[in-house]
């Protein structure tokens, strides 16, 4: 029996480091958070897409000022406090890369592939992400909440210049999709392929990246104007130029996801030890 208790204590000590970061976070747009009906709608959607208790999540309210600080010089849009509806949930215990669920009944512009591109530019390729809103929304401003959710879950900040580069990339994607009339996911594929090639060649020069944009767009049968090709190249170049600032965040992300994965196995061992303890005590009671 003593060995069983010691085993449980050792396993509990092994999992204790993960509590420096939650691994599970939710952000609510301030408009949604201030309206109980709207917030309940969002929570119902989140509950239907996770087996975890929402009360266990680290939560934060995303304000208009936070969104504007990142996006206003990129999009030219200024959001008021009654316009921030989008909400995001991030769970880092998901261990199969990244999975993004977008509530298509509410988020009507930005797709899961577009969010995936922006997150990759932010050093994020792991986790389970859910994005929704209580009313129809473009989803562009939601990126601020998604990134904030990752910061809460990871326990580390994403540099502001990285957030701005990711926001510019997402906004450019939506603009190009709108201007060309192409399927948004096809434009997201274009961005993904260009980024992959730019990363492969370690390119940061917009002129060099523009050549890649033109070639890949032609392969995908996407007709771009010279200005559009330049706009895409500039956005991806900006993303490439800030990747060096992500070292600390990416290390922390890898650490917490690794700890969570290890924790899953350790919890199984704890349950086994508890079962052994239960069986031992039951045996004493029954005299067997």
Predicted segments with their positions:
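Hydrophobic, Leu/Ile/Phe/Ala-enriched alpha-helical segments that form helix-helix packing faces
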Residues: 13, 41-50, 118-119, 150, ...
